[in-house]
């Protein structure tokens, strides 16, 4: 294998060619940073969190492929992944994951002690999630916790504390992750049933679409409550209304459970995250005394 081929395999291992995972992890982190800083996050902290998100998501992908190295060859969507296809070794995947995790840890060392302490459970959750599909009926809930840890870390880095509001945002994001990752799981449900993998799409059975919609509703309702506590204005609530419209569009995509359409719905969640961030950003830029 040439150097270019190996570099391409490494890039595909950590999914740099598929940035959707980075974006879905980044949006709630940015929500947390902007709300913690009331619209004026420290530039150094912002850069650290953006780079850290990229590094940890990439490390998580490498760990995921290591954990699923004997499963991926039997799933049509994943059989061509570098590790499953034999282009790289399990040892290489572990070394890459460890290297990226170390870089992410070194990156946060300039931040306060609380942020560094929170990075420990964040790393554990990211590293252990891929193995939960063997014994958890709802591994998407575990992923939701892992994908939400950027929020308390953002508050800790920006303010030195983790207030109840941060955990309310974690709760909201948890249900969002369950919703979009269940859409993702619908793509592979037929293969997962054959090989015995557990996912929320399998656990929910015929209530899968209803469960996704319920999780989206809880997600948006919790954000609405957070907005009330923070006395947010029209831009924030307008963004939530747009996000609700996007959820309705997603329902049209997933209601027939066609794998290709379910995957499109999963990708569509990037726009929900972006719209909510835009609402938070505009709300802090054009703050008025009026709020709902």
Curated annotation (Swiss-Prot):
Family the entry assigns: Belongs to the UbiA prenyltransferase family.
Organism of provenance: Nitrosomonas europaea (strain ATCC 19718 / CIP 103999 / KCTC 2705 / NBRC 14298)
- GO MF annotations for this entry? 4-hydroxybenzoate polyprenyltransferase activity
Q: Give membrane topology per the record.
A: Multi-pass membrane protein
Q: Where in the cell does this protein reside?
A: Cell inner membrane
| Gene Ontology terms describing biological process | ubiquinone biosynthetic process
Source organism's superkingdom?
Bacteria
- Keywords (A to Z) from UniProt: Cell inner membrane, Cell membrane, Magnesium, Membrane, Transferase, Transmembrane, Transmembrane helix, Ubiquinone biosynthesis
Cofactor names from the entry are: Mg(2+)
GO cellular component terms, alphabetically, are: plasma membrane
Catalysed reaction, written as an equation = all-trans-octaprenyl diphosphate + 4-hydroxybenzoate = 4-hydroxy-3-(all-trans-octaprenyl)benzoate + diphosphate
Pathway assignment: Cofactor biosynthesis; ubiquinone biosynthesis
Indicate the transmembrane segments per the record.
20-40, 43-63, 94-114, 135-155, 160-180, 209-229, 234-254, 266-286
Which named protein is this?
A: 4-hydroxybenzoate octaprenyltransferase
């Amino acid at each position: 294998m040439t150097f270019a081929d190996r570099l391409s395999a490494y890039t595909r291992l950590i999914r740099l060619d598929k940035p959707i995972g980075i974006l879905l992890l980044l949006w709630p982190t940015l929500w947390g940073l902007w709300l913690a800083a009331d619209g004026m996050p420290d530039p150094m902290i912002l850069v650290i969190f953006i780079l850290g998100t990229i590094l940890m998501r990439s490390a998580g992908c490498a760990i995921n492929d290591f954990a699923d190295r004997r499963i991926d060859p039997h799933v049509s969507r994943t059989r061509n992944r570098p590790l499953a296809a034999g282009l790289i070794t399990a040892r290489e995947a572990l070394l890459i994951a460890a290297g990226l995790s170390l870089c992410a840890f070194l990156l946060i060392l300039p931040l306060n002690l609380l942020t560094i302490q929170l990075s420990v459970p964040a790393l554990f959750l990211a590293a252990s999630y891929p193995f939960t599909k063997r014994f958890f009926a709802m591994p998407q809930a575990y992923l939701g916790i892992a994908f939400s840890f950027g929020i308390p870390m953002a508050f800790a880095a920006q303010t030195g504390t983790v207030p109840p509001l941060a955990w309310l945002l974690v709760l909201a994001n948890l249900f969002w992750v369950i919703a979009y990752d269940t859409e993702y799981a619908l793509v592979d449900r037929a293969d997962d049933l054959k090989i015995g993998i557990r996912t929320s799409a399998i656990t929910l059975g015929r209530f899968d679409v209803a469960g996704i919609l319920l999780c989206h509703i809880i997600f948006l309702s919790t954000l609405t409550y957070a907005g009330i506590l923070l006395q947010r204005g029209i831009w924030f609530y307008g963004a939530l209304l747009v996000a609700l419209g996007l959820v309705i569009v997603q329902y049209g995509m997933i209601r027939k459970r066609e794998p290709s359409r379910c995957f499109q719905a999963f990708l569509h969640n990037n726009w929900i995250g972006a719209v909510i961030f835009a609402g938070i950003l505009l709300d802090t830029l054009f703050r008025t005394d009026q709020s709902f």
